């Protein structure tokens, strides 16, 4: 069975800094905090939470201030099976002060910190490995024009040497992506007082050569200024994670019919998961479908797997019953029907057969958990989290 650590952020608590005023976006986005600015009709922060849930983060703490009640109302206390905590500053505390306020929620050996107005998707597994043994590890993003950020300089040992100031020269460079791994010891040393992580803590650690750099070419987006915010829609579209009309955000469910189905997590001998690229939306999901009249859940699962993948499988366990309407609402494109999915999730292993696509799938592929595509259908994410952490017999509402 799968090693739990195959999930790149398994056991990691994450802090997202969402307390800024967003003054540079005034006139473009005025009625919501910057991290909740809409992109393709959906709050920017939702994309970050989707990604962290998919990557297996143990929990997320939102460090807020400006319009904190609104942030809490929109995000709630759970996201696709991932707990969400809220830490609220009563007065401006700076980023380091905000983290100090949130310490009780951040208990993992290393804590991942990120800004709520940037998107950066490094190889989290490699990033975590690079951060081992260090107090502070900063991710360096490569951008075509580093003039507005300033750049990072590091030595052959991978330790940060200095920050170069912003310049008028429009040239590519390595910048601070605003994503960090911080040790529990360093986090514990922060005091609840106004203090900037970027302007005070990080420079002081740099002088003592205590900061490691993780360089990556992963895509980077900062929505802090109007022109970059305007580019966010194309950015997410190119990543194939723009919202799909098949998966509306939870709203009025009175018109929805409840559909009982199965969802099957099939592992191979390498611990990889079989996923199918759905023909109805182009996103990745798991084999499964409706339980027909006269069928048992097991019979339905075996039939759906055979029809959609060409495989014969052995059911090895019951993972849980998943029914949360906030993440399991689907509008089918062929007839417009709105359904709330209630899925019996089962574990299985392949016995025989050759992978064969069907009318319901564009592609079939085995993925290790840290390679699961970003454009995975929302109802599947919490099932994958449970399967990869070996959580069994759980009723998720």
Predicted segments — roles?
Residues 149, 177, 255, 261-262, ...:
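Short loop/turn microsegments at loop-to-beta-strand junctions
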Residues 291-315, 322-386, 396-397:
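Unchanged
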Residues 27, 91, 141-143, 169-171, ...:
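Short Gly/Pro-enriched turn/cap motifs at secondary-structure boundaries
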Residues 3, 237-265, 335-336:
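Acidic, metal-coordinating catalytic segment for phosphate/diphosphate chemistry
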Residues 160, 272-273, 355:
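Hydrophobic "anchor" residues
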């Amino acid at each position: 069975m799968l090693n739990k650590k195959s999930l790149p952020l398994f056991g990691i608590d994450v802090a997202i800094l969402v307390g800024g005023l967003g003054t540079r976006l005034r006139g473009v986005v005025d009625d919501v905090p910057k991290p909740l600015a809409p992109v393709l009709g959906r709050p920017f922060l939702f994309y970050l939470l989707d990604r962290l849930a998919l990557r297996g983060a143990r929990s997320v703490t939102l460090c807020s201030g400006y319009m904190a009640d609104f942030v809490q109302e929109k995000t709630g206390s759970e996201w696709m099976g991932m707990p969400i905590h809220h830490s609220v500053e009563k007065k401006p505390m700076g980023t380091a002060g905000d983290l100090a306020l949130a310490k009780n929620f951040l208990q993992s050996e290393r804590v991942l910190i990120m800004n709520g107005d940037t998107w950066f998707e490094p190889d989290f597994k490699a990033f975590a490995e690079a951060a081992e043994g260090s107090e502070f590890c900063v991710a360096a993003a490569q951008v075509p024009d580093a003039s507005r950020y300033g750049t990072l300089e590091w030595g052959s040992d991978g330790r940060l040497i200095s920050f170069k100031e912003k310049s008028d020269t429009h040239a590519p460079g390595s910048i601070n992506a605003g994503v960090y791994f911080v040790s529990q010891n360093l986090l514990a040393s922060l005091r609840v007082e106004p203090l900037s992580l970027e302007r005070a803590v990080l420079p002081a650690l740099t002088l003592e050569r205590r900061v490691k750099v993780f360089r990556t070419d992963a895509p980077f987006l900062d929505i802090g200024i109007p022109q970059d915010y305007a580019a966010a829609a194309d950015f997410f579209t190119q990543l194939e994670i723009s919202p799909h009309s098949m998966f509306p955000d939870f709203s009025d469910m009175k018109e929805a019919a409840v559909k009982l189905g199965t969802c099957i997590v099939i592992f191979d001998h390498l611990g990889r998961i079989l996923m199918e690229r759905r023909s109805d939306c182009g996103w990745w999901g798991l084999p499964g479908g409706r339980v027909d009249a006269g069928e048992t859940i097991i019979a339905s699962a075996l039939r759906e797997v055979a029809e959609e993948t060409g495989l014969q499988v052995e059911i090895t366990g019951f993972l849980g019953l998943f029914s949360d309407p906030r993440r399991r609402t689907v509008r089918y494109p062929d007839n417009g029907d709105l359904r709330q999915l209630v899925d019996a999730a089962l574990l299985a292993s392949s016995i025989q057969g050759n992978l064969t696509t069907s009318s319901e799938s564009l592609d079939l592929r085995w993925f290790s958990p840290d390679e699961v595509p970003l454009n995975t259908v929302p109802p599947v994410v919490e099932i994958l989290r449970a399967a990869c952490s070996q959580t069994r017999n759980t009723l998720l509402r």
